[in-house]
Amino acid sequence: MSAIVLEQADRLFHEHVTPAVQADADRSVWPTDLWRAVEEAGLTLALVPEHAGGFGLPPDDALRVIRRSAWAAAPIPLAETMVAAGLWSLTGGDVPEGSLTLGPVNQADAITAERRAGGWRLDGRVRRIPWGSAAGNVLLHAVSTDGEPLVALVPSDTLDWASRRNLADEPRDRLSLSGLDVRWDAVHPAPAACRDGFLPLGALIRSQQMVGALERALDHALLHAGERRQFGRSLSKFQAVQHMLAEAAGHFAAATAAADLAAAEWSAAGGLEAGAEAVAELAFPIAVAKARTGEAAGIVAAIVHQVHGAMGFTQEHPLHYSTRRLWSWRDEFGGESHWQAEIGRLVCSRGGAALWERLAT
């Protein structure tokens, strides 16, 4: 099943993620045909159980699809839609058609929810929501005045947005909520997977995406080094270039191992259906994955651009579709320093013996 789904996804991205589509996306043109193909393939509902009308894909397979979409630099909120749809279905809500996103995406932002007659009132300000107003609906994490974690699904066209973009020219809009009234059935208790917010889940999907983009960037560099000739021989024959590529490959391998471990443990715990105890145990591998992939992103992006020289900085060369995403994704849902500090906090709270057991098993 896994191989079939990945093969289907690869074919889809190869057919629909063209240079023209990517260039149009940089100019804020929504890739209608690509999104339609993704929806028709059922990929947007990959993490929605079959009994709820979804695909019910195993969690690790869903993450592999996310990784492949990042390899292709698909300019769509597939990862965000997968996770938001899966979480909303767990609350018993009906998953709407179209693209989804989620927020807040950092610890500094928060939304409060006050119960009102016939519904809820939401207040707060959220920065840099992925895809923001371009998505059809937004899954918002909020905390009630009683301290209960909640999720609310709100149509994006009813919200007050300020347009922003990241380095990859993807929408990262700012949302202002000032007494927004929503119906009672648009708000549900948050599943265990996101009771404390979306930061860990976001870090998990960004780590998978960065591995995909790292692989594509390294593919570009290896191809260029093999084809480009200087002083009568290919760049790959020069020892200095070989050392740079070896360094990049080493960081890619370490980042992949960290992301693979987080994906495997998340899948074994039940994915989005993981209970509170399992979610707490997943904090460590997710922190390691996000910190290590973020570190690799900066190093590998610098190396592959050095290998390409001036050619790699041109708009016409596809390398920037991978590296601009790497530079953006490494800072989203917590950068390296945040997750390195989280690793330290977890180690100190559990003691050295627990760390050794964690590393040795």
Locations of the language-model features?
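Cytochrome P450 C-terminal beta-domain/meander region
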Residues: A110-R121
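A short, Trp-centered hydrophobic/proline-enriched beta-strand micro-motif
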Residues: A46, V95-A108, L140
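Structural signature of FAD isoalloxazine-binding scaffolds in flavoprotein oxidoreductases
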Residues: G56-V65, L100-D109, D181
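A short core secondary-structure module
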Residues: R125-L159, R164
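A short, charged helix-loop
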Residues: R172-G202
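N-terminal glycine-rich flavin-associated loop
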Residues: D24, A74-T91
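Alpha-helical interface subdomain recognition
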Residues: M1-A70, P200-T361
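Short secondary-structure junctions
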Residues: A113, T158-R165, D181-H188
